[in-house]
Amino acid sequence: MDKEFKQTFPAECDKAIASGNIKTIDATIEKLEKLKSNSSEGLVLSQMLYCLSNLHFTKAGIENEKIDQWRESVFPQNMVKSLNYVRQAYSMAIKFNSLQILDIQTNLANNIRAFNRFIEAIHYYTFDYNFNLQIDSQYVAPYNKAYMLMLLKDLLSEQSASIHYSYYAYNLIDKLNANQEKITHTGIKNCMEKEAWVKNLLKWGSSVKLEYEKLNEQLNSIQYDNLEQKIYYSWCGQNKLFLNPINDVRTDIPAFEDTIQFPNYVVKIGEGPYYSAAFSDIKNRFCKARYLLFNALNNPFPDWLEKGLNLTTVLEYEDYSTNTEFIKVAIKLAFSTLDSLAALMKNYFEIDCKGKCYFNPSWIRKSFSNIQNPYIDALYWLSCDLTDTDNIEDWNAPNPSAGILRKLRNDLEHNWVRISEATHTIWLGEHDYAMTCTLEQISTAALEVFRYVRTALIYFVLAVQFNEKLKNEKESDGLCVTMETPTYNDLSSPIF
């Protein structure tokens, strides 16, 4: 039976999904879980994980799971399982060069999108589309990416980002429209024919394109102060680390600026731009930490900085270099911006809570249970990725794989992290309480941390923008105005 199911499980999963029957889906999940437990890493296991993700995603839809019910401590268990399974499937598909990689990547984007994490979904919807390949991902990914771009563009206060998102959405829809006869996905075909936003985008596409071309010429005229700046900007762009939504659709010169700011917001007359200034401090800290990481990863510091320190070795090829220490410092700085962001969230949204603010699921759930905002949802679920739940009782959602990043942060702050290339030790190790990792592992983790923090800052700005759109022009206790905040670069001299 197991041998037969191993050969037919993809078809069996499709049948279970098509049935729409919970009992059938549960039975298939149980059989596939058993098969998975006896399988080793490889293409077959990647496909099993992909199928498990699809089964749980379908079950979540049937049971009407909601991603915003974390406010009542009701968690979409099947949706979380679906996301985690497809993440594992994607990692394994890359490792073993799966021919199914684009379908898995598109489903990963669909799962992330379901949690309102639209910025991250855009990343996974992006690949070289080939409309001659008769696979669903070639049509689903560009359509969904275009939809996400159009959804976000109206909340982007920076005009150049809005123009970019409109143009890239138009470009995708225009190409799909030109290849309509090749579309095999029924749902996408129907959407292309019937959706009003698609028709409007195609109608106004030529003017969008003209506006984009004018802007593109202007943005491409950037002048560098020196070669180091050019190399640094290119590194930030390629790694999608600019605080700029344009960097999510392109990685070249027009994205080379940290444009996001605290949106214009309603205040009482006479009140200063303190929320905006607080966000500027967070933004500045992130950008300086990013430059520190760039230098730590790319520019060797002098060896004499370690001379005369008499550092102890445990004979495991430890790395005490200044570069490695600065990677650690950069990670701590990046993480520190998240707790500062939590404090700003508390103050801007006028949350009445005592004690410290922490960017973690428990604090966000307790503090934002009465605020409905899709980008607060995004921040909540992003915080879940960064949470080590080993010792947290007041949280019921499963811990995603990225919890190792939070553990790294905690050990950098409260324990110690040894960078070592050794595969074994000559010691008993009973006194060894360090977290150990290689230079490659901590370097990869650092980039991942910075991407998470960058995305969190963008989601926060979108949350504020969304909230301001819902606000009335007047508060009940007095006359208010919208504050357009001054920037540091606008001031030729200090105010005082």
Residues covered by each model-derived region:
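Residue position in alpha-helical solenoids
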Residues: 31-38, 92, 131, 172-182
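Charged alpha-helical initiation segments
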Residues: 1-12, 20, 60, 206-327, ...
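Helix-turn-helix repeat elements of alpha-solenoid scaffolds
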Residues: 16-35, 72-88, 114-127, 163-168
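Short coil/linker segments at helix-helix boundaries
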Residues: 59-81, 155-168, 305-315
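Amphipathic, Lys/Arg-enriched alpha-helical patches that create a basic surface
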Residues: 406-408, 426-496
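TPR/TPR-like (Sel1-like) alpha-helical repeat modules
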Residues: 126, 157-184
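Amphipathic alpha-helical repeat scaffolds of TPR domains
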Residues: 2-19, 40-70, 97-114, 137-156, ...
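Short non-catalytic regulatory patches outside canonical folded cores
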Residues: 315-415
